[in-house]
Amino acid sequence: MCFVLILLMVAFLSNNPVLTRGDGPPPQPADQVYNEMQTVYLGNLARRDHGVPPLRWNAPMTEAARWFSWDSVENRPGGYCGHLDTLGRWPSERVPLFGYQGYSGAENCYCGYMLPQDAITGWMSSPGHRANLLDPNSREIGMGYYRQDTGGRGYLTQDFGHDPVYPPVVINYEALQTADPSVQLYVYDRETGGGFAGLGAAAEMMVANDVCFSGADWQPYAAEKSWTLPPGTGWRTVYVKTRDAVGRTTVASDAIYLGQNVPTNELGLHLASTNTQEVTLYGLDEGWPSVQLSQNWFVDDTFGTFGLLWGNGERVQDAVALGGTAFRLRPGGGESSAWVWTTEFFQETPFVAYFRLKVNNNTSSGEVARIFVKGGGTDYGPLSLKGTDFTSIDAYQDFPVAFTFHHNPADVFLIFQFWRSGDADVTLDGVYIFADSQPVQSPLTWPLPGGNYRGGGIWVRYTDGAGHFSPIEEADLTPAERLVVSPEALVFLAEVGKPSPPAQTLTIRQEGCQPFTWGVSDNAVWLETELVEGDTVQVRVDIAGMAIGSYQAMITIEAESWVLGSPVHIPVKLMVAEKIWRCYLPLTLRDHRP
């Protein structure tokens, strides 16, 4: 049998796909999921050998790759070798339809079924496929295997991409398992660019074995880091939070199985990177009527288009400014003005721009500054500021301007501009951008503008609708503290006059980041509960002197009053029988040989 390799190299940034994906393959068998993940790992070893960072396995791209492999077999009965699917879509069109919103389009295929090592060997032996596999611009990968149950026809698809808003973390080159808790992490830096929604390069990071970052401290960013997993056996997840010079954060994670033999029935796309269209916030202050949210949208004097328009002005070092620098406009020679602009931001969505300004003299009742926004040809402002509008000198203060960036082919710019118009120095730290106010509730699920949430930090600002607003804080994205107990019920079966049945256990799980205490109690003299480990309660029954019959009791696990899900009541049923009869079911082996 002949196997053909094909490739396509193109880059395309997803936005608002309109095509449909059609029918799709059946659920992926565990052995094929294993092959997909192993192919990703072996490809990363090839990248390592050529000095290229590893790729993070991605769920939406894998779904796209699986669909195309299935389509190329089941909907092409005469065989097929190419990149155009039966709905007329190329990879750059197909991959976004499955939810991936980064750059995509590069694709490797095998027009036949190959095992992981053979597939990587074949691709590395072909110059074009090798170039795709070793492309340093790719950060994520989708891998799709398909093979017919009858006939054996198969197809392999490998899709590549990178999303500017997502800096992946990869454990041990995306290996499925490790027997050694000491692992190597590759932590991607954030891509700069992306307009006013972009991030700066990572300055610091923290690493933890739990999503709460318990005990973690900020440390200088490094792409490669040694790390130790918690001991024992099972799946382990490592979380990495990075932040740039102005404090914009993002969180990424990866998982690996710690142990000798990975359970293939536990493999799946839940282990891959993904994205969502919304994010849920917890612990919001419901004492305010409204809240504004921002996915770290901030622009300052370090942005590439920031510049002095006219008059006296320069960048200055400022220890209290975000990022350590600001832009000062000075008196002399008339007014002075500076601006910053972009063509990349979310359109037709109401926002509020907060200009973070300070002056060195606030005594004037006349105008000392003006601020202005222009979005797609529509002017907002200018807002005139008097010296007395500043509550103190040399202290930054936020001034809001509501705006919408309209879609306008004749004017594609979003512009923030500020003037010095008086005798005081006017210094701009930067401009925060928040979505328009919405009612406060907690938890609150926020559909993000652009619909592509990938772990970025969320800023919160509360407002009262009368011009007052709170300081900015970072939202809590971890679920509120909750008490969870399993199993939900216990049943004991005993024989009168015989020893009591074996003990059973309850597992207590604390969700959320704030530790809490809990206790256990019961309401029956024949029931005994004992805390044997930090999260396990051992339950015994004592049937001494008990008559034949059915007995009911209740175990109560209760945490502090503010913990959700508490108390938890676990019903216990004890059945004492005169005699317990054990039966054994027959096992029949049938030989179907002719």
Predicted feature locations:
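Functional surface patches built around histidine and acidic residues
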Residues: 18-188, 197
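Extracellular carbohydrate-recognition regions
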Residues: 36, 285-288, 292-319, 583-588
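Low-complexity, disordered linker/stalk regions enriched in Pro/Thr/Ser/Gly
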Residues: 166-295, 439-479
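Conserved structural position at the C-terminal beta-strand
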Residues: 242, 418, 462, 557-559
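Short carbohydrate-recognition loop motifs
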Residues: 315-336
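Extracellular carbohydrate recognition and processing domains
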Residues: 377-411
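Short beta-strand-plus-loop segments that form exposed binding edges in beta-rich domains
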Residues: 415-423
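Feature for long, exposed domains in two main contexts
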Residues: 479-582, 591
